[in-house]
């Protein structure tokens, strides 16, 4: 839930996130252009990446398909690599939002190393031993 009085600017390539944020009066929404992936309703490609390069977000919340302490963040779709890399490169801090089932998994295309994240947030129970593998790599684990 987003508090009604939260004032911020959201830069996104996701139409779903843009819609949710647009319902809050205090949130300014900037949508990146590019090629539309209809399955996820996100924009991707070089146009989106070039637009993202014009911004320097304080904080980037990155949804994660697969993450591993050794192999970093990986995704199954090559079209998403450039926009994700650019958002990570441009941001001061990057927080990974991870379903516990995605921990210690690897997909086809590497986006970044684990060291590119400052924090990992998960929405479920994670065994202490698994969490330690990420903490030992320097991540805050919430």
Tell me what each language-model feature is:
Residues 1-6, 21-25:
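Active-site catalytic pocket residues across diverse enzymes, especially alpha/beta-hydrolases
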Residues 5-10, 117-119:
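Short active-site oxyanion
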Residues 13:
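Active-site catalytic microenvironments in core metabolic enzymes, especially phosphate/sugar-handling
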Residues 16-142:
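Conserved phosphate- and dinucleotide-binding cores of soluble alpha/beta proteins
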């Amino acid at each position: 839930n987003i508090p009604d009085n939260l004032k911020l600017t959201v830069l996104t390539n996701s139409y779903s996130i843009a819609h949710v944020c647009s319902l809050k009066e205090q949130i300014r929404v900037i949508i990146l252009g590019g090629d539309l992936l209809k399955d996820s309703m996100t924009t991707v490609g070089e146009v989106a990446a070039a637009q993202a390069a014009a911004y320097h977000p304080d904080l980037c919340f990155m949804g994660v398909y697969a993450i591993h302490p050794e192999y970093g963040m990986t995704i199954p779709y090559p079209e998403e690599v450039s926009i994700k890399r650019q958002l990570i490169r441009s941001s001061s801090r990057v927080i990974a939002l991870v379903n516990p089932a995605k921990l210690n998994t690897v997909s086809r295309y590497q986006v970044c190393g684990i060291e590119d994240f400052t924090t990992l947030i998960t929405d479920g129970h994670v065994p202490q031993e698994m969490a330690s593998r990420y903490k030992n790599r320097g991540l805050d684990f919430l």
